[in-house]
Amino acid sequence: MPELPEVETVRRGLAALVEGKIVTNVVVRYSKMVSPKAEIFAEELEGKKILNVRRRGKYLLIDFSGDYTMVSHLRMEGKYSVVDRREEYGKHDHVIFELDDGKDLRYNDTRKFGRMNLVPTGEELQVGGLKTIGPEPTPETLTLEYLTHQLRNRKRGMKSFLLDQSMIAGLGNIYADEVLWLSKIHPQQISNTLTDEEIAILRESIFEELQLAIEAKGTTVFSYLNADGHAGSFQNQLHVYHRQGLPCQRCGTPIERIKVAQRGTHFCPHCQVLR
């Protein structure tokens, strides 16, 4: 599933390609993917200008003229691309936004899990998981005071805590593993046992890891592509994720893989000791 760095990379690509363009027609080939009903969804967007492409956590927010905002969640396999309209539809191109420059903004999703909700601008934070989403992982919004309070007032494994979108927005399986390795914290360490120093290091590790991943245009482990159709490159910089059996880049101990919070979880048993 695309996490914050991947969605931010898609956002930047789409902003450069489609902001200012007018939607002349919308083709919905899989009606369960959109809300409201496909006919209304298409009718409301026809003739609207794309004003802005934003992001909140793992969600894309596309603002249109007429005070509409589309909330788009890529889920597992969703991808956006901008192509020449003469190009044939792909098998998994499910929603097509025809633009006034002769190109299409196409949404492709092999597993059909992605969703698009069109709502009046200002109501986008009432859609799905956005109702309870936590702060963005930036120094301004993820303060040390906030993080300390949330960790100290909960008795949860650290991997589960980081995956909880109501605690911190945007982290998923890949970056949770990587952040915990950077912080030398075991994935099953209980949140309220962290020291002040560990919490401070964890916070800085979150900022560092996500910034590096955004600069590398995300991680492509399976099928993620950005809006230009290119893979990310951060998979070449991963320390633990999908590296089970390989030596830890810090101490040489083989990386192990266990199941935590129903997710495959990678860590170094020497650097990340469970207390």
Swiss-Prot record:
DNA-binding in keyword set: yes
Any Gene Ontology biological process: base-excision repair
EC numbers, comma separated: 3.2.2.23, 4.2.99.18
Superkingdom of the organism of origin: Bacteria
Pfam families attached to this UniProt entry: Fapy_DNA_glyco, H2TH, zf-FPG_IleRS
Stretches of the chain forming a coiled coil according to its record: none
Function in brief: Involved in base excision repair of DNA damaged by oxidation or by mutagenic agents. Acts as a DNA glycosylase that recognizes and removes damaged bases. Has a preference for oxidized purines, such as 7,8-dihydro-8-oxoguanine (8-oxoG). Has AP (apurinic/apyrimidinic) lyase activity and introduces nicks in the DNA strand. Cleaves the DNA backbone by beta-delta elimination to generate a single-strand break at the site of the removed base with both 3'- and 5'-phosphates.
Keyword check for NADP: no
Active site location: P2 (schiff-base intermediate with dna), E3 (proton donor), K58 (proton donor), R263 (proton donor)
Cofactor(s) needed for function: Zn(2+)
Oligomer and partners: Monomer.
Cofactor: how bound: Binds 1 zinc ion per subunit.
Name of the gene this protein is made from: mutM
Organism: Pediococcus pentosaceus (strain ATCC 25745 / CCUG 21536 / LMG 10740 / 183-1w)
Cross-referenced InterPro entries: DNA_glyclase/AP_lyase_DNA-bd, DNA_glyclase_Znf_dom_DNA_BS, Formamido-pyr_DNA_Glyclase, FPG_cat, MutM-like_N-ter, Ribosomal_uS13-like_H2TH, Znf_DNA_glyclase/AP_lyase, Znf_FPG/IleRS
Positions annotated to bind DNA: H92, R111, R154
GO MF entry, a single one: class I DNA-(apurinic or apyrimidinic site) endonuclease activity
Highest classification ranks of the organism: Bacteria, Bacillati, Bacillota, Bacilli, Lactobacillales
Protein name: Formamidopyrimidine-DNA glycosylase
Catalysed transformations (reactions): Hydrolysis of DNA containing ring-opened 7-methylguanine residues, releasing 2,6-diamino-4-hydroxy-5-(N-methyl)formamidopyrimidine; 2'-deoxyribonucleotide-(2'-deoxyribose 5'-phosphate)-2'-deoxyribonucleotide-DNA = a 3'-end 2'-deoxyribonucleotide-(2,3-dehydro-2,3-deoxyribose 5'-phosphate)-DNA + a 5'-end 5'-phospho-2'-deoxyribonucleoside-DNA + H(+)
Family: Belongs to the FPG family.
Keyword vocabulary terms for this entry: DNA damage, DNA repair, DNA-binding, Glycosidase, Hydrolase, Lyase, Metal-binding, Multifunctional enzyme, Zinc, Zinc-finger
Zinc finger annotations (FPG-type) as residue ranges: 239-273
